[in-house]
Amino acid sequence: MRLDSVRLSHYRNYESLELSFSEKTNVLIGENAQGKTNLLEAIYVLALAKSHRTTHDKELIQWDAETARVEGRIHKRRGSHSQEIAISSRGKKAKLNHLEQRRLSDYVGALNIVLFAPEDLHIVKGSPQIRRRFLDMEIGQVSPVYLHELSQYLKVLKQRNALLKQLSMKGGDETFLDVLTEQMITLAVKIVQRRHHFIAQLEKWARPIHEGISRGQEQLVLIYRSDTFSNDLLDVEGMTASYMQKFGKMKTNEIRRGVTLFGPHRDDFEMEVNGRNVQTYGSQGQQRTAALSLKLAEIELIHEEVGEYPLLLLDDVLSELDDHRQTHLLDTMQQKVQTILTTTSVDGIAHETIKQAKLFHVKQGAVILEETSYKEIVGEKTDE
């Protein structure tokens, strides 16, 4: 699949912008704080209906404007379609082919993307919350039903926490708590099973990629972690029984503290390299390799699940990678995916993918198609 064009209206520092992209590689060149990342973020929002940089949608709306809007034209093997996301103080509206989608789970997945940014290193070394968000966003792209189940789970969890807080302060009948617990466990089992499947598929692709980047010196393993059951107990009956047993043990403490103390909203996944936890014991180089391997594996996993390669967004990551890791990433771009990347300069990047790219210059919220060639920009001699 590819993003043919995008149009922004009152999005962050862009009052109005319309761009058409190459089906291969597109490079946004500019100094920092000019709007390069804002443009990539807008494309991310177009695809997933939420930002990867903020949880406050009002930050996406240009100052003094009422509504931010991102529109795109997407081409797939079976045809083209339009997408639109509008963000205002009243909420979000998402449209496919000009028809409003009532549920975001019906919208997400129409445009598949993989974003790789410097902060993605936090997937490896950051908090469990960051890794759970990673799982939820990526699974949601290939499994709309997962987003629906997750939404239902979070609603029940919110109700359950409110009831637990009430019971902790005032006491009362605990019958409704048992009802909410059963509902939560039913949804939790479905969510965890889908997460396990995703982790297994991601590892299948990430292991050989990681081995290649590490020149055969390292083996990457992904492990889902739950404090309720072991990874060899994944059938519905066994997981349900484990959750119910956990609830029995935690009920008194949950009521005392007024909060839910078990469930997939508290789970995590670990990355091990040669048997050692890379989050805790890995060098920065190993952590970068693990993060890059996960992102390149995402590309293959999405292709396997939906039958088309996703759009790849790279936010100033080439400067963060050494030549060896950079080459692995650029080789993938050249062979398979449409890519939109940001950088302050293409100096020192001699890969053929960049030499053949469509170049844009970004300055103060304006984007201009670069008429000069890569060779002229980096000072190489052109053929006469």
UniProtKB/Swiss-Prot annotation:
GO cellular component terms, A-Z: cytoplasm
Domain of life: Bacteria
Principal place of residence: cytoplasm
Subcellular location: Cytoplasm
Xref: Pfam families: SMC_N
GO molecular function, one term: ATP binding
Annotated binding of ATP, by residue: G30, E31, N32, A33, Q34, G35, K36, T37
Key words, A-Z: ATP-binding, Cytoplasm, DNA damage, DNA repair, DNA replication, DNA-binding, Nucleotide-binding, SOS response
BP-aspect Gene Ontology terms: DNA replication; DNA synthesis involved in DNA repair; double-strand break repair; SOS response
Biological role: The RecF protein is involved in DNA metabolism; it is required for DNA replication and normal SOS inducibility. RecF binds preferentially to single-stranded, linear DNA. It also seems to bind ATP.
Family per record: Belongs to the RecF family.
Name of the protein: DNA replication and repair protein RecF
Organism the protein comes from: Exiguobacterium sibiricum (strain DSM 17290 / CCUG 55495 / CIP 109462 / JCM 13490 / 255-15)
